[in-house]
Design a protein with these regions (language model features):
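Short edge-strand/loop segments of extracellular domains
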Residues: 21-30, 373, 588-589
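Beta-strand acidic-aromatic groove motif in beta-rich domains, primarily in extracellular
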Residues: 11-25, 63-65, 76, 291, ...
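Cellulosome-associated attachment modules in secreted, modular CAZymes
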Residues: 90-172
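Trp-centered recognition loops
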Residues: 6, 43-50, 60, 288, ...
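Extra-cytoplasmic beta-strand recognition segments
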Residues: 1-19, 49-56, 65, 80-85, ...
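Surface-exposed loop/edge segments in extracytoplasmic proteins
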Residues: 28-37, 589-595
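Carbohydrate-active catalytic/glycan-binding domains of CAZyme proteins
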Residues: 170-594, 599-636
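Extracellular carbohydrate recognition
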Residues: 59, 68-85, 486-490, 625-635
Length: 636
């Protein structure tokens, strides 16, 4: 067959790549997408996409012809879409002439004729839009004396490429624009560092320190609805991903995305759920390896492995690590909630289990600890029972000094106990051996409802960072701020203090931890690193991008050290329809230090904002006027 269509666009870059494609279903029932024709269009000029001898695959059904761009989201127009017998030449706009800045007549070279045509265009008119775009060598949007001088300098050998003009931002117009924009509301109050992130929920924090950076892995709670669209109680049935965030200052957290663990799209496709993660790293055969343990509902503990704390992750076993067929595990009520520790000698230990058999509130006997194999994905011995009084769930295992600590959540029937413990609280036990026996030590964290008013299951991790101990736990602060109630949880952190081997009671706060170090603005910082936000989301995995930005949305980066000053901030961002960014300090309504304009077209590009007044330690805000995505930023 012979196919042809004409394409034209008016937004974005000077050129764009277009494809005429055929979507079809093959004999195996799989969707296929084949290129019929392609071409490069110059903005404002028609281009023809044509192939006069295209062979449609013999097994193709459900066929659709369509046009798309290579990367951008530019609006475009189509005309004269024609199909004919193979070999037919279809008259159309034809191919675009080669486009190069400075080559005004499109003859493939830049010479005196191009300079003459550019001068003629400045004083009169260009032969077409392609000629005008080629003469605009500094890409300022207009052709003027600056372009003529640059072409002349190029011909004289003074320059070898054309510099891009910095767009002058109309500050008065920007001030007027943002005066009419109300910043979106955050789920955190000013001065609060808890919860750690708010763009998604995140429960059951499992924490790992690696090279001075803290990685927090959480159950990705998903809001559930009834048939009428009302929020219902969290059943955890839809949880098949694990969130990963990290920080080196305990306040600004980088969102590495939600790891697809279970289900048909997951890494462990045989699993249905991914709850209560924990993580560890270990040097094996001279190489650092990372291990992410999770539970497949209440019926087994599984493990993923990677060469980096953010993945990509793989399923080394293709099945659970611990099941009810594992010795001494068949009668565990809830076979879940793993916690892992790598001892000083490199030996790994895993705790797990939970649940309260009928009549055994005081001593459920459902917790286990096991020595792992050298590979961290096998068991070296039979799991040992931990006699933890009033156990409910949520195991933890740590070595502090020379003492091993087993920590857990107490059950809901603790009244009258002899230990002085309360219900749904984090308790601790101590031992001189990671396999026990353990002796009850005390209560280190009451139920979070005591501090925040919303009671629920308690789940924690203890992690040492730079010699300081921290308690990570979850709370229901974000769902409260959203005005919903269904046990949807978010991670928080507060400091642990000790008296000898006694863990002092931790107080839960919304203020959280003070920032441990300043942010360096003179290196590229990911946009997904933030201390607070309103309205945004994050897409991707590992190397992510801030997305779903709309009018009034914003990102906050706390404690940025501008001791060297700054004259510009460069953003890497995109917008389908164009977007302005207000860069300010103190609050989303604070005084602007500069503005940036993201061009339309949907293509990630660097945009620069001239800034002034940035000195000392500042909380930096990026406030947006419309739809956008943002990848990173750097100050110069």
């Amino acid at each position: 067959y012979s196919f042809s269509v004409n394409v034209e666009y008016f937004d974005g870059d000077a050129t764009d790549q277009f494809f005429l494609k055929l979507a079809y279903t093959d004999a195996n029932g799989e969707a296929q997408y084949a290129t019929v024709a392609e071409g490069t269009a110059v903005k404002g000029e028609w281009v023809q996409l044509a192939n006069k001898n295209y062979q449609i695959p013999a097994d193709a059904t459900n066929m659709v012809l369509y046009v798309e761009t290579a990367e951008s989201t530019n609006n475009f127009y189509l005309d004269e879409a024609i199909g004919a017998v193979g070999g037919t030449s279809i008259l159309g706009a034809g191919e675009s002439k080669p486009f190069h800045l400075g080559d005004v007549n499109a003859d493939g070279v830049i010479n005196g004729m191009d300079l003459a045509l550019a001068r003629q265009g400045v004083s009169g008119a260009f032969s077409g839009n392609a000629a005008r775009l080629a003469a605009d060598v500094d890409q300022s949007g207009s052709v003027n004396g600056t372009d003529l001088q640059l072409i002349q300098d190029y011909l004289l050998g003074k320059i070898t490429e054309f510099p891009i003009a910095e767009k002058t931002v109309d500050t008065a117009a920007m001030e007027k624009l943002f005066a009419g924009i109300t910043p979106a509301a955050s789920y955190k109050a000013e001065g609060e560092n808890n919860p750690l992130f708010t763009q998604r929920f995140g429960a059951d924090p499992g924490v790992m320190e690696y090279n001075g950076r803290v990685y927090v892995y959480t159950t990705n709670d998903v809001i559930e609805y009834d048939s009428n669209g009302n929020v219902t109680e969290n059943t955890y049935a839809q949880v098949n991903k694990i969130n990963c965030i990290s920080s080196d200052d305990m306040v600004n957290w980088t969102d590495h995305g939600a790891i697809p663990v279970a289900g048909t799209e997951g890494i462990a496709k045989w699993a249905t759920c991914s709850w209560a993660p924990c993580a560890a790293h270990k040097t094996i055969n001279g190489k650092e390896k990372f291990f992410l343990y999770f539970c497949n509902g209440g019926n087994g503990v599984s493990v993923l492995t990677a060469d980096s704390p953010t993945g990509p992750w793989s399923d080394p076993l293709g099945k659970a690590l611990i099941t009810r067929a594992t010795p001494n595990c068949g009668d565990i009520t809830w076979l879940f909630d793993p916690a892992v520790m790598v001892d000083d000698d490199g030996t790994g230990y895993l705790c797990f289990g939970g649940g309260v058999p009928d009549g055994k509130d005081a001593m459920p006997g459902t917790s286990r600890v096991v020595k792992l194999g050298e590979d961290m994905i096998s068991l070296a011995e039979t799991p040992v029972t931990i006699e933890a009084p009033y156990l409910f769930e949520d195991s933890g295992i740590n070595k502090i000094g020379d003492t091993y600590y087993y920590t857990y959540c107490s059950n809901w029937n603790t009244s009258g106990n002899s230990y002085g413990m309360t219900s749904g609280a984090i308790e601790y036990m101590t031992a001189s051996n990671p396999l026990g026996p353990y002796t009850y030590g005390g209560e280190l964290f009451p139920n979070q409802g005591k501090f925040f008013g919303l009671y629920g299951n308690n789940h924690h991790s203890i992690c040492a960072v730079n010699g300081q101990l921290y308690l990570f736990y979850h709370n229901r602060s974000v769902e409260k701020a959203m005005g919903i109630e269904g046990n949807y949880r978010s991670p928080q952190v507060d400091q642990i203090t000790m008296t000898d081997t006694k863990i002092n009671t931790v107080t839960g706060t919304m203020k959280g931890i003070a920032q441990q170090k300043s942010v360096n603005p003179y290196v590229k910082n990911p946009a997904e690193m933030m201390s607070d936000q309103a309205g945004i989301n994050v897409r991707g995995l590992g190397d992510t991008v801030v997305t779903e930005i709309d009018k009034g949305d914003w990102i906050k980066v706390s404690g940025v050290d501008f001791s060297k000053g700054a004259s510009q901030i460069i953003l890497t961002a995109s917008s389908k329809s164009g977007c302005a960014v207000k860069i300010c300090t103190g609050s989303p309504t604070g005084k602007a230090v500069g503005y940036a304009e993201i061009p339309a077209g949907g293509k990630l590009s660097e945009v620069s904002a001239a800034v002034q007044g940035l000195t000392g330690n500042q909380d930096l805000y990026f406030v947006f006027s419309g739809q956008a995505e943002m990848d990173c930023w750097i100050a110069k």
